[in-house]
Amino acid sequence: LRLLNLINQILEFRKTETQNKKLCVSKGNIAPLIHEIGLKYKELNQKTKIDFQIQIEKEEMLLFFDKEIITIVLDNLISNAIKYTEQGRVTLSLYQTMRNEVAYTEIKVSDTGYGISAEALPHIFDRYYQESGKHQASGTGIGLALVKNLVTLHEGEIRAESMQNEGSTFYISLLTDNIYPNAL
């Protein structure tokens, strides 16, 4: 199963690199999808010292989105959060915010894990980059690069904040009113 996931991740990454991955959006309520993804990880989480939380601001949040892309992005971010957290909390949040009079729908994945060093933080979305150190886990270094490519394809933004030994937070910002005229 792990090998299959790795192969799928590499194939998805290549599609984003060669512009063969197409954005396929439909208008809908994103809240149930986020809740469903969160419940999957809440049930799959085998680390008893991690409290997995789902925080959804409103039951109805309408926007155009690509369900497959959102799922792949969150699968990567949440599995990383669980992998790099021994104990504490992993939280998946969905909310709406305004910046410069523009409405955004934001998805946030935060953890109380090992965190990312200040030196590594600017490079985490680079292809094949892996932070070295005592908490390095097995991987290919394409997970976050794939996430970045998919969020960019979705015309969104992703950013990360982290403090070593305190945890990390990843923010995905999507324009709430984007109608994606060039999407399928």
What are these regions (language model features)?
Residues 14-25:
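Helix-loop junction within the histidine kinase core
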